[in-house]
Amino acid sequence: MVYSVAMNQSYSEKTTLIDAREMGEALDSIEIHAPEYAKAKAERIHLDDYRKVQLALLYEHAEGRTVVEKESWCKAHAQYREVLTEHANAVERETALYWKLKLAETQIEVWRTIQASRRREAQIL
C-alpha cells in the first residue's frame, strides 16, 4: 500500500487514498501478524534468558585462572556465539513484526482521521 500524493491532487482526491478495502487489509494484517509477533517476542525473551544459562554452563568448563580469563573464554566459545546469533535473529524478527503491526495501526489511525475530517467537512457544508 503506497500513499504517495501528487501535489496537484485536490483534498477530496487525497482522502480517497485509504478506502474500506485497505482498512480491511490493515485489520487482516494485524490479525495475521499479532500472533507471530507474540511468538517472536516470546522467543526473544527465552533467548535472553538462555544466553545467560549458556554462559553459566560454559563458565563451569572455562579455562583460565581469573574471572576475566574465564569470561573471555566463555564469550569466545562457539556455543555462546551461536546463542548470540540466534538471539540477534530473534530480535530482528520481533522488530520486523512490531513495525508491521505499527504500520497497520497507523493506517487505521489515518483512515479514522480522514473519516472525522469528512464528517466535519459535511457539517460545515
Regions found by a protein language model. Name each.
Residues Q9, R120-L125:
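Short acidic DE-rich linear segments
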Residues K41-R44, D48, K52, T85-R118:
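Long amphipathic alpha-helical coiled-coil segments
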Residues M1-V2, L125:
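Acidic, gly/ser/pro-rich intrinsically disordered tails
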Residues G64-R93:
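Short, glycine/alanine-rich amphipathic alpha-helical segment
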Residues G24-L27, T113-E121:
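Short A/G/S/P-biased low-complexity tracts
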Residues V2-P35:
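Short, charge-rich amphipathic alpha-helices with coiled-coil/heptad character
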Residues Y37, R44-S72:
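Extended alpha-helical coiled-coil "stalk/arm" regions
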Residues D19, H33-P35, V67-E69, V83, ...:
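Generic alpha-helix initiation/capping and coil-helix boundary signal
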